[in-house]
UniProtKB/Swiss-Prot annotation:
Dimer of a small and a large subunit. NCBIfam families: phage_term_2. This is Uncharacterized protein YqaT. The keyword ATP-binding does not apply. Pfam families: Terminase_3 (PF04466), Terminase_3C (PF17288). Keywords: Viral genome packaging, Viral release from host cell. Gene3D superfamilies: 3.30.420.280, P-loop containing nucleotide triphosphate hydrolases. To B.subtilis XtmB and phage SPP1 terminase large subunit. The keyword Nucleus does not apply. May function as a terminase. InterPro entries: P-loop_NTPase, Phage_terminase_lsu, Terminase_L_C, Terminase_L_N, Viral_DNA_packaging_terminase. The lineage of its organism: Bacteria, Bacillati, Bacillota, Bacilli, Bacillales.
Length: 431
């Protein structure tokens, strides 16, 4: 069993001296890959039950579970390790196993016993109360206990920064994060700290690193997170890359796109909230989003709205609409509209917002006045302590909801997903 690893992670793979291991860093640094490898190596040697946690259970399948599945195959362990997809579980011939749970289904955590190892992936997305609950689930009569937490850095208002580094309001200091960025690996009390960036992943292509560098030009906050791997103070604007341009210029740009993807989304309203419909176009190669048409009205009954939007019944353009209103969708369908409900799930509000933020530019026609009014200054809501709430805003942006729905099944290339940071023997190393 031979596996290439990145040198910056060699020490981490076999160091189990501390109870907590906190890995923070930029995109493509191979954090998750090496955590998964570390756990597999541990469970091959010792009979343990490991619990892998994400905030939303369903996100495991294409992330952590997929990663373990690939590792087992790459390491040629299929004869002693079995990956079961329903329910997701990894079983070892020595009795070890890895189980996967989500904090969105807390009741399923209550039946778990004898957990000696927990990995919280994307721990910044888990609530602090959830973290403390997991500490209570980490118990075993004989084996040493370990918790691994991995994340990209977010704002300094996130609990991960306050718990593992410093909380100025509570006058609590654990470690200076700037010292970690300089030294890269630090052991403090019972916590092993590890910092990494894309530069530590020798298996990444230069083109990927260049994409991260380009973030500096259009999203400084994301550059700090993705390229530098640093915590910091997030700007309050949700879409700093949003810009307004003359309608003719927008339409010309769309006409020049190589195979543009065009979509329509609708958010329902009535009295105080608005019916918002947007037409958007995506330049997949440039990662540009164009918004070139809008409808924005309230106080109308469904029949009046259908009459005003009758062009869609004629063109049969597919409209992705708010699935929370199945009766309204059915009404429009009965009146000739090609309308379906968009995918919504627990946590989708945050995930859809993150998706839209991944566009390099969001270019809006100056004719879409309500979209501009809502999105250009759109800011995050804050709690009573002034901390940003990532899935809440200072207003209810109906046009943003319409964009979410329009693009529900389209994925902006995520710089984190473009390279999973998983060393492959067949891939040439980056020099």
């Amino acid at each position: 069993m031979i596996k290439q690893v990145n040198p910056h992670f060699k020490e981490f793979l076999f160091d189990w001296n501390q109870k907590f291991q906190f890995l923070v860093g930029g995109y493509g640094s191979s954090k998750s890959y090496h955590v998964a490898l570390k756990i597999v190596l541990k469970l091959l040697r010792e009979k343990r039950t490991a619990l892998v946690i994400r905030e939303v259970y369903d996100t495991h399948r294409d992330s952590t579970f997929s990663l373990f599945d690939e590792l087992v195959s790459d390491l040629k362990l299929d004869h002693i390790v079995r990956c079961v997809s329903s329910p997701m579980q990894i079983r070892f011939s020595n009795g070890s196993r890895i189980i996967f749970k989500g904090m969105d289904k807390p009741a399923k955590l209550k039946s778990i016993n004898n957990i000696s190892l927990i990995w919280i992936e994307e721990c910044s997305e888990v609530k602090y109360e959830g973290f403390k609950e997991l500490l209570g689930r980490l118990r075993h009569p004989t084996l040493p206990l370990h918790m691994i937490l991995s994340t990209n850095p977010v704002g300094e208002d996130n609990w991960t920064f306050k718990h593992f580094f410093k909380d100025d309001r509570e006058k609590r200091f654990v470690l200076d994060d700037k010292e970690l960025y300089e030294k890269r690996i630090i052991v403090s009390n019972d916590t092993y700290y590890h910092h990494s960036t894309a530069d530590d992943n020798l298996f990444l292509p230069e083109s990927y690193v260049q994409q991260l560098e380009e973030l500096k030009e259009y999203d400084p906050d994301l550059y700090r997170i993705a390229r530098k791997g640093h915590f910091g103070v997030n700007g309050i604007r949700v879409l700093p890359q949003f810009e307004e341009r003359p309608h003719e210029e927008v339409m010309t740009a769309i006409s020049n796109i190589n195979r543009p993807l065009k979509r329509v989304g609708m958010d329902f309203g009535f009295v105080e909230s608005y019916n918002a419909v947007v037409r958007v176009a995506v330049d997949h190669e440039k990662k540009y989003l164009y918004i070139y048409w809008e409808y924005y009205k309230n106080g109308l009954t469904d029949d009046k709205t259908a009459e005003e939007l009758k062009e869609f019944a004629e063109t049969k353009e597919l409209i992705k609409a708010d699935s929370a209103e199945p009766k309204t969708i059915r009404y429009f369908q009965q009146h000739g509209f090609n309308m379906v409900g968009a995918r919504k799930y627990q946590g989708s509000r945050l995930q859809y917002t993150k998706k839209i933020k991944r566009f390099r530019k969001i270019i809006c026609s100056d004719r879409c006045e309500n979209t501009i009014y809502e999105l250009k200054p759109l800011a995050y809501a804050t709690d009573k302590l002034g901390n940003i709430i990532e899935d809440e805003f200072t207003i209810d942006p109906h046009t943003l909801s319409a964009i979410w729905y329009a693009l529900d099944d389209y994925e902006v290339t995520d710089l984190k997903e473009e390279s999973k940071g998983r060393p492959q023997r067949s891939r040439p190393g980056r020099r």
